[in-house]
Structure formats: C-alpha cells, structure tokens
Curated annotation (Swiss-Prot):
A GO cellular component annotation in the UniProt record: cytoplasm
Encoding gene per record: MPS1
Binding site for ATP: L29, G30, Q31, G32, A33, Y34, G35, I36, V37, K52
One matching Pfam family: Pkinase
SUPFAM superfamilies: Protein kinase-like (PK-like)
Name by which UniProt lists this protein: Mitogen-activated protein kinase MPS1
EC number: 2.7.11.24
Record keyword ATP-binding present: yes
Annotated SMART domains: S_TKc
GO biological process, one term: positive regulation of calcium ion import across plasma membrane
Keyword Cell membrane found: no
Molecular function per GO: ATP binding; MAP kinase activity; protein serine kinase activity
Length: 415
C-alpha cells in the first residue's frame, strides 16, 4: 500500500478516485457528507462492485471513529446474506492518509428509491423486505450490536428482491446492564423520522427495541408509500407519533427522563390511538398486527426481532434453522480511544489485515446459503429521478429552543 503501483485513477464527481487496476469505474452512484460511491467492474471476472471512498476521515474525531466503527463491523458481519458484504479495502497513500476505499457488493438501488419511484409493490414484496430486514437484524443484535440508523436509504435492494442492511457508522454496543449500556450512547444523530420515542424522551437506557421501532416505521412507509412520522423538527416528530399512537399510559409517562419533555406531553390534550386499519384500509390484517406490535410506544411492550420473525405475517418465509445468530459478540473496546493518531493507526492496521485475509482466503466469512426471496421488483422501480429529503439533524443543537434541544439530544444530552 506504499504507492499507486497496481492502481488506476478515475474522476468520480470531479474527485480523484484511486482503484485497483483490476477494476474499471462504470458509473457514479452517489455522494454525501461521508464520501462518494461509484460502480465498477472487475475486468477479469466481469463482476460488479460498489466502491466507497470515505473522505475527510480525520478532519473530525467523530468521523474517524465512525470510519473505524464501520470498517470493524462490516468485517464482523461479513457473509450474512442480508448484510452488505465487504470484499476489499484500500488506502492507496498510507502516509498521512485522509481517505479509505471500501469495495462492497453492488446492489441495484436502495429501498428509499423504490418507494419513491411510485412503482406498485405487492404485499408479497412487503413480506419479503421485512423478513430480510429482520433476519439481518437478528444477526446484528445477537452480536450485542444496535444498528441505530435503520431507514430505507440504508437498505440496499437488487432486482430479484434481495435486501441487505448497510451503513454501520452509528452502531453501538448493547448490554443488559443499563449503566454499561448508557456509556455507548453518545453522539447519536440518527435520522429523525425513524427514531424511537424513548430516545427523544430520555428513557433510562436504550435497548434493541429502538431498531424494531425503525423497522415498524419502514413497514408503515411500505404500506403507505411515504414516511409515516415525517416530523419537521423534533417537537413535531413527537407530536406526530402521539397523534397516531395516542397518549401514553401513566406508567409509560412516568418513565420519561426529561422533566421538560414529560411536562410537555402531560399538558397536551388526551389523544386516542388511531386504528391502523383506518390508516391503511387495503393492507393485509396480519401486516397491521405486526405493525401495531412494532410501533408500541413503550419499548418494553414492543415485539422483539425473534418474535417478529415468528409472526403470522412472515410465516411464508420463516425458517428458524435458516435464521442464524452471529457466532461471536462484537468487541467495542476501541470506542474508548480518543486520540486521532491512534485511530489512524488502527484503521491502517484493519485495512492491512483485511487485505491479507481476502488475498489468502477469498471465500472467508460466509454464513448461511444465499436464498433471496424471488419476488421481482417492478420494472423501473428505483430508476426515477427524485430529490431525497434529509431529515438528519445537525451535529449540534445550540440554536434550538429548550424542548427541541432536549428531544434532539435525548438520552445522550443528559450524559
């Protein structure tokens, strides 16, 4: 990795994109705050890959930690059929580098593009998507990891309806000990529309239920064709949730950790829960029953991933013998590292070790035989042009009013 030998330079979004000489860049796929992505083809095998250039890795400590977290978790989960597979990594200029290249599975589009394309999807599509999300999430949770940013844009889909979870940059560890758990829950800026109410309302700790809430929001979006809780800000987000789910009971209200937020909710007029069959009159009743259990306001009442996989709505796909747990839990000890120089060394070591692994054992890491549900996506889905709305909050909340700031920071704000 000492120089550009064995690599080629392409222009992607007007930036230099340095790739292994075996590959030719074929298409620009996207760009965002954390980097740019293109499609490429292996000139020897004709297989396609997605190459992600993570930029400005060390411009902020939070970005360096995010890159390290993503690299480690993609390796840990490598091979599960519903989690994006990491094929290779590269740091072309390791001396004082500020960018890292990740070679991953190439997928057709993300679920957000499919939903927003307006193409008709059937109940069979919904079952397939939710089942695959839950299979991937079961594997993630069994490693004591919370994804914390599940949303349609982080679910990659192929034309044959194969779905894979991506983007682990906001993931954190989970412990049954609330005090130990709380230590990992910092710098949380996950997407507002899919964010569980207990996070905004500062319940004592987070649990795996926060990811289940996000899956419920995704199911509702599939059923309705648009985001279910589309808050303009955090106060509006909370209001929209309460408007649909109704006023929480006293036991739940008493667990709201933020006094200001608790007072706000108590001072609202009583709201009755809106029946899901009224909101989604054409939906499968089993889908609405699962949705109701996923969107339980109180996380202690929310259905678990394991229970959801056994729900009647998913019986056509459910096979306990083909829904594996991760063999090992994930070690989050690196999270305590705060020195950027140390993180730079850790990322370099991770990339070097992984390159050695894939060059000596290319097939390492498989878990479970691929079996993508064969429900084709309608032609044209994901092909249309649409302007994505970004509900992600700012990294700071200093210009918000007091209640908005508390809801944005949630439990993290109190640490």
């Amino acid at each position: 990795m000492s120089d550009l030998q064995g690599r080629k330079i392409f222009k992607v979004f007007n930036q230099d994109f340095i790739v292994d000489e075996r590959y030719t860049v074929t298409k620009e796929l996207g760009q965002g705050a954390y980097g740019i992505v293109c499609a490429a083809v292996n000139n020897q095998t004709s297989e396609g890959v997605a190459i992600k250039k993570v930029t400005n890795v060390f411009s902020k400590k939070i970005l360096a930690k995010r890159a390290l977290r993503e690299i480690k978790l993609l390796q840990h989960f490598r091979g599960h059929r519903n989690i994006t597979c990491l094929y290779d990594m590269d740091i072309p200029r390791p001396d004082n580098f500020n960018e890292t290249y990740l070679y991953e599975e190439l997928m057709e589009c993300d679920l957000a593009a499919i939903i927003r394309s307006g193409q008709p999807l059937t109940d069979a599509h919904f079952q397939s998507f939710i089942y695959q999300i839950l299979c991937g999430l079961k594997y993630i949770h069994s490693a004591n990891v919370l994804h914390r940013d599940l949303k349609p844009g982080n679910l990659l889909v192929n034309a044959d309806c194969e779905l894979k979870i991506c983007d682990f940059g906001l993931a954190r560890g989970f412990s049954v000990d609330p005090e130990e758990n709380a230590g990992y829950m910092t710098e949380y800026v996950a997407t507002r529309w899919y964010r569980a109410p207990e996070i905004m309302l500062s319940f004592q700790s987070y649990t795996k239920a926060i990811d289940v809430w996000s899956v419920g929001c995704i199911l509702a979006e599939l059923l309705g064709g648009r985001p279910f809780f589309k808050g303009r800000d955090y106060v509006d987000q909370l209001n929209q949730i309460l408007h649909i789910l109704g006023t929480p009971n006293e036991e739940t209200l008493s667990r709201i950790g933020s006094p200001r937020a608790q007072e706000y909710v108590r001072n609202l007029p009583f709201m009755a829960k809106k029946p899901f069959p009224t909101l989604f009159p054409n939906a499968n009743p089993d889908a609405l029953d699962l949705l109701d259990r996923m969107l339980a306001f109180d996380p202690s009442s929310r259905i678990s991933v394991e229970q959801a996989l056994e729900h009647p709505y998913l019986h056509i796909w459910h096979d306990a013998s083909d829904e594996p747990d991760c063999p090992t839990t994930f070690n989050f000890d690196f999270e305590v590292v705060e020195d950027v120089g140390e993180m730079r060394k850790m990322i370099l070591d991770e990339v070097y070790r992984f390159r050695q692994l894939v060059r000596t054992a290319p097939g390492a890491g498989g878990h479970g035989a691929p079996h993508a549900p064969q429900v084709p996506i309608p032609a044209g889905a994901g092909q249309g042009q649409w302007k994505a709305e970004d509900p992600r909050p700012q990294e700071y909340v200093g210009q918000m009013n007091d209640l908005e700031a508390e809801l944005a920071g949630g439990l993290d704000q109190r640490r």
